[in-house]
Curated annotation (Swiss-Prot):
This is Photosystem II reaction center protein K. One of the components of the core complex of photosystem II (PSII). PSII is a light-driven water:plastoquinone oxidoreductase that uses light energy to abstract electrons from H(2)O, generating O(2) and a proton gradient subsequently used for ATP formation. It consists of a core antenna complex that captures photons, and an electron transfer chain that converts photonic excitation into a charge separation. Residues 1-10 form a propeptide. Belongs to the PsbK family. It is found in: Cellular thylakoid membrane. PSII is composed of 1 copy each of membrane proteins PsbA, PsbB, PsbC, PsbD, PsbE, PsbF, PsbH, PsbI, PsbJ, PsbK, PsbL, PsbM, PsbT, PsbX, PsbY, PsbZ, Psb30/Ycf12, peripheral proteins PsbO, CyanoQ (PsbQ), PsbU, PsbV and a large number of cofactors. It forms dimeric complexes. One of its GO terms (cellular component) is plasma membrane-derived thylakoid membrane. PANTHER family: PHOTOSYSTEM II REACTION CENTER PROTEIN K, PTHR35325. One of its GO terms (biological process) is photosynthesis. HAMAP family: PSII_PsbK (MF_00441). Its main location: membrane.
Amino acid sequence: MVNAALPLLAQLPEAYRAFGPLVDILPLIPVFFLLLAFVWQASVGFR
């Protein structure tokens, strides 16, 4: 029963189809913040 529902849940509904690429990018935002923290600390000399 659960295995039959997984492909259905894996696809976005038609109304949200345009946001597909955005959904692919959103999980990467925390990684960018982590990298930004390292760049910031490197610029201030790791005080």
